[in-house]
Design a protein with these regions (language model features):
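Interhelical loop and helix-boundary elements at the membrane-water interface
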Residues: 12-37, 80-103, 120, 135-167, ...
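Core segments of transmembrane alpha-helices
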Residues: 37-40, 103-109, 164-175, 238-246, ...
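Central hydrophobic cores of alpha-helical transmembrane segments in multi-pass inner-membrane proteins
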Residues: 40, 44, 62-74, 108, ...
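Membrane-embedded alpha-helical segments that form the functional core of polytopic membrane enzymes
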Residues: 51-72, 127-131, 185-207
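Transmembrane helix-loop-helix
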Residues: 53-58, 101-147, 235-286
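Solvent-exposed interhelical
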Residues: 67-106, 115, 201-242
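Functional transmembrane core segments of multi-pass inner-membrane proteins
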Residues: 158, 162-206, 213
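Juxtamembrane boundary at the C-terminal end of a transmembrane helix
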Residues: 305-311
Length: 311
């Protein structure tokens, strides 16, 4: 950490503008602002796939929910950060703990209020997803029942973290919009859009966990990389990416999804090849890693926006 700090001082002296930009980006990723933007962008992609109108309040609902859940889960999983070799991020969390609480509670309340304003069903979707997210690290099963269930917390279930993250993102991104919009969408589009969001957010969660194996093992957080190991996890991610791209191509060719599916499938494959060829076997620094996975979703949202605008 001392060497890292010295390198940062050298970079700041050599290029103060770049150092300032990196500090801003570090704050945005540490506070999960970029994660919220990525989630909102992905929700827009889901709306385009379903052929539904997308409004600002839907974007804000997803943005606030995802950003709040990521921040609040840092308080329910205390002790994880000290196992990560990420001194800059640890310093942000240590110095700005009150701000973190505010950035968790206020957006969480905003997502609940927005869900309520959109209607009964959107409110219930957000409420249920929020309760499950907050209960993830809480001991919900009494100790005396441990022998019957085999677990006390939801996070004790094998690979539970990745499944819960993907399910929450997909549920909040798809169903509030589906329940509110008056236009009808085909059941096949609803199902395929949900599967698309579930898979891409699941891949994101798994890929991030590959670099946090040591911390997850120490705190007992069950993830796919811990269950399968790094080698088999990489194989699983490759299979999911290729399968998702092929599925999008087929769905577009059969008319089950609109033409944007062609573009999304190609974008996913290009991103996959970029990661395989450029970063194979190399661990990315935390800032670059988080920015890369979030920008992947943000660019997908921009592609969907341009496609709809031109169409």
């Amino acid at each position: 950490r001392v060497m890292t700090h010295l390198r940062e001082l050298e970079e700041a002296d050599a290029n103060p503008v770049l150092a300032r930009v990196k500090r801003v980006l570090e704050a945005l990723t540490s506070l999960h602002i970029t994660t919220g933007l990525a989630a909102g962008s992905l929700a827009y992609v889901g709306a385009v796939l379903m052929g539904l109108h997308f409004r600002l309040d839907f974007f804000l609902l997803v943005f606030f929910y995802v950003q709040a859940m990521h921040v609040l889960n840092r308080f329910t999983e205390t002790g994880v950060d000290k196992f990560r070799d990420d001194p800059k991020r640890q310093e942000i969390y240590r110095r700005h703990r009150i701000i973190l609480w505010v950035l968790g509670i206020v957006p969480f309340a905003a997502s609940i209020v927005l869900g309520f304003m959109l209607g009964v069903w959107p409110f219930l979707v957000v409420l249920i997803a929020s309760i499950l997210g907050l209960l993830y690290s809480v001991k919900v099963v009494p100790k005396s029942w441990m022998g019957l269930f085999g677990f006390r917390r939801l996070k004790d279930l094998a690979a539970s973290k990745n499944v819960f993250v993907a399910s929450a993102w997909a549920l909040v991104s798809i169903f509030p919009l589906f329940f509110v919009e008056e236009q009808t969408t085909q059941p096949s589009r609803l199902l395929l859009s949900f599967v698309f969001l579930f898979v891409v957010t699941g891949i994101r969660s798994i890929w991030l966990d590959l670099s946090d194996l040591a911390a997850d093992r120490l705190v007992g957080r069950e993830t796919v990389p811990l269950v399968l190991g790094p080698t088999r996890t990489h194989s699983l991610v490759r299979t999911l990416i290729v399968g998702l791209s092929v599925g999008l191509y087929l769905a577009a060719a059969l008319g089950w999804l609109p033409g944007i599916a062609w573009i999304l499938a190609t974008w996913i494959l290009l991103e996959f090849l970029y990661l395989e060829l450029l970063y194979r076997g190399n661990a990315l620094p935390t800032l670059e890693r988080d920015m890369l996975v979030d920008l992947h979703f943000i660019v997908a949202g921009l592609l969907a926006f341009v496609w709809r605008a031109l169409g």
